[in-house]
Amino acid sequence: MGLVQKIFGTHSQHELKRINPIADKVESYREEYSKLTDEQLKAKTKEFKERLAKGETLDDILPEAYATVREAGKRVLGMEHYRVQIIGGIILHQGRIAEMRTGEGKTLVCTLPAYLNALEEKGVLVVTVNDYLAKRDAEWMGQIHNFLGLSVGIVLHDMKDDERRAAYACDITYVTNNELGFDYLRDNMAIYKEQLVLRDLHYCIIDEVDSVLIDEARTPLIISGQSGKSTKLYELCDVLARQLVKGTYHGERTKMQVMMQEEIEEDGDFIVNEKDKVVNLTEQGIHKVEQFFHIDNYADIENLEIQHNVTLALRAHYLMFRDKDYVIKDDEVLIVDEFTGRIMPGRRYSDGLHQAIEAKEHVKVKRESKTLATITFQNFFNKFDKKAGMTGTALTEEKEFRGIYNMDVVEVPTNRPVARIDHNDAVFKTMKGKFNAVVEEVVASHEKGQPVLVGTINIDTSELLSDMLKKRGIPHNVLNAKYHELEAEIVAEAGKHGAVTIATNMAGRGTDIKLDDEARAAGGLKIIGTERHESRRIDNQLRGRAGRQGDPGESLFYISLEDNLMRLFAQETLMNTFNKLGVGENDQIEHKLLSNAIETAQKKIETNNYGIRCHLLEYDQVMNEQREIMYAERRRVLDGESMRSSIMKMITDFVEGVVNRCVSDDKSADEWNYDEINELLLPTIPVEPVVYDENVKNKNELTHVLKEKAVKLYEDKEAMFPEPETIREIERVVLLKVIDRKWMDHIDDMDQLKQGIGLQAYGQKDPVVQYKMMGYDMFDEMTQAITEDTVRLLMHIQVEEKVEREQVAKVTGTNKDEGPSVKGPVKRTDKKIYPNDLCPCGSGKKYKNCCGRKA
């Protein structure tokens, strides 16, 4: 805490002063409400709705509503909200983020704002990170809402459209962030209004809000169809990548080097900048690529695809690592989530990176998919009228929550004081020395019966430590992406006395680790971190596994100067300093220089990652504005509005466009190029050919005459249909078909533009500005193409022609974790679940021990 905060207090402290009087008012109703009968308590819901109808606001009835939920929780679940939980509930109602420590009962907190906001009858969405939590919370907390007369729905990955629609129609709906986002995209691909499943996006409460809005912000939701693109180029570039020689990275050029115009001597064919995760070819490398592909100029725009694929192949080889970023299972490349350590089946890296890794690992290279619909979580959740979030760790990212989502973070005090002891970092010169010390610490804790959770940031480290502990005869469990099926069982055992658990970030959140009495007496759970994560927030999550609800516990991080974080981001002088001091391999180092270096390194990375997310949002904002326009137009069609006026405008706009292209103001009528006018006009609007007419003297008169003819032609077409609604439905069908086809092509075009836009920087132009300008031009071209295609199709429609709405493209999948197929407008590939498979609900249990029992 800085000096200013010590004197004036933190933002959270100021906000809590404002919130405390509201919490006092809630508590003042406790005695009165405890005397109400069940019927009287249930009747409160109807009373609140009537008061809202008469003009009272949610803020007016909040104290009584929260007191009602509190009393219902006590009667139905035997759980009464603590004061700190009421404070958390008030923060959530205000559309903010409540930071509450692990074990403080965030699930119960959620019932307060969910109930209050559901009284408006506009729907409340409680968003969780997996199906297991959505199902558990809906069935558990739903009992309170049901008791008070509200309906509770749940959306799971294998539900059909009718079930989803019914769930979203409930007062309160529990759903995962992925299912919700994909339902939004699918709704905007629907061809009939009856296929829509979502209501308007009114209010949502996001559990683990940092995971959803920060960690997943860089990965857009994508619904894809099959692309016709060949995979041969990926395999060729992989062959090339193996032949190229890695050069030396000399770091970023200093200001002095730039001023003195010093040239850095390049060696090798390419340079890898691990810090910024960038690969660049040298002059020598570019020459080799040109020879390999028999091309004259690598930088030519027609070689954009080769440029992209060569970079991907080098990234796959030198920046993506097996058993850290991905694993190979059943001849398939599966992504490992860097924040949770979990495997993400069904999810693929975009832009061809996944195919490049498949080529590198010699597994079958799957065809790249065509994007049919896409949106980022940033833009999706900003569509809600009001949103709130809960998490144990958000303060470190408050700047981002404020800047991108307009949400501030309020730290809620714990119900009981935190008894966990957080030790200073233990720093060693080498990794070997660090791991030796970790093993000694584990052995010492195990011998006195204290449970230990060792956190690692990748699979390799967890397996290395496991081997070292086996040699010392220490029984232990390993939890990483390779053994994720056993997660629930391993976490349940982790709090028992003498238990030793080695886990990747998977154990960082989710199920609580409960201590037995002997473990409590031995000092509680000891957390040992084997490396600092790039994000302080992930380190804090690991620490937070110990010391829940006043339990004893300890946390300690072991670090070496050879760790990636220190190697890439800390000062190089540190290693030299400790070498001069004669520090041995197994000597522990403690120095203020080190603590500062670690914190500075993490802050650097966090700032860098924040910059990347802001940069991505700048690009996506262009697509978002265009998406809003297209989806609004689609919704008009689905809502069954008459599109006649829009069609008439398209007809007249098209005519005007043709005349403007072919006729200049300074030429007389006998000089006009009538062949060109007919060439552009007649294939779309088959009127009589345009010829010289002495009565038509200028451009405006020609435009007026041709508009009248075109409108008359369309009116004659309308008259051919005995039922007016027939032609209205045909207009809707044609518009939907054309909009969808052109929009899908436009998504691809914008993606191609984004991939190549970086080259604009070489011409001293801002790539983002250029992307916006070119993107808007492309959007304008697309809308003109929609006008032309729609008019042409309608002008040539025949009365006997059968016209039905149909999907423009077949959906083949999404980029997120998926279970069995969902029937309806979106088709997913159905996969058989075997008894020993991980249950698709996300519980971490085997299918036979979970949902398979009920099957």
Protein language model regions, located:
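Conserved P-loop NTPase motor core
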Residues: 1-582, 631-632, 648-649, 653
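Generic anion/oxyanion-binding catalytic loop in active/binding sites
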Residues: 30, 427, 619, 732, ...
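Active-site-adjacent structural elements in folded domains
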Residues: 110, 438, 824-826, 834
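Extended, charged helical/alpha-beta scaffold domains that provide interaction surfaces
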Residues: 326-334, 340-347, 549-550, 557, ...
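Short, Lys/Glu-rich amphipathic helical modules
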Residues: 448-462, 639-641, 691-695, 840
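Hydrophobic, well-ordered secondary-structure elements that form the walls
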Residues: 454, 502, 743, 779, ...
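Short Cys/His-rich zinc-binding micro-motifs
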Residues: 829-848, 852
